Amino acid sequence: SALVQKLWNYCNILRDDGLSYGDYVEQLTYLLFLKMADEQSRPPHNRPSPIPKGFDWRSLLKLDGDDLETHYRHALEELGKRPGMLGLIFRKAQNKIQDPAKLRRLIVDLINKEEWSRLDADVKGDAYEGLLQKNAEDVKGGAGQYFTPRALIAAMVDVMAPQPGQSICDPACGTGG
């Protein structure tokens, strides 16, 4: 899809700075979470945002240069300290995009231009799957396998909180990581 291609093209720009595909998908996931939380807090949804003011999407849009990079790094750190699901999502999160101009471009030119909450779930899923597929093709020589980032696996295990002796079935998980 055009969205996957747009996301992938930007990934290639960041790759030139030494950012791995896994790091790109991880950073994209954090930023999309913040953007979609912001969208859900606005009309027509008007839901309370789980993101504390000052660490939210709008705070990122107001900054650029080193101020943006410093604020984003601090926001990830603070969000990782929050209780509940929010803390789990951002636990051990780090900014891997060291060039503030590229971080700003990712935020303003790529992510902010889309209304992600209005996109069909299939479109978002296809975009994420497309990135993982392109990653697998590029990194693994086209093995056709999708590799789930370790941080995502750890977050899913924390959310499910399996007890010893319990099994969790996900028929779509392939090898399970």
Show which residues each predicted segment covers.
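Glycine-rich SAM-binding Motif I of class I
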Residues: 176-177
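Non-catalytic, mostly N-terminal accessory regions of nucleic-acid modification and defense proteins
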Residues: 1-164
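Conserved class I S-adenosyl-L-methionine
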Residues: 165-172
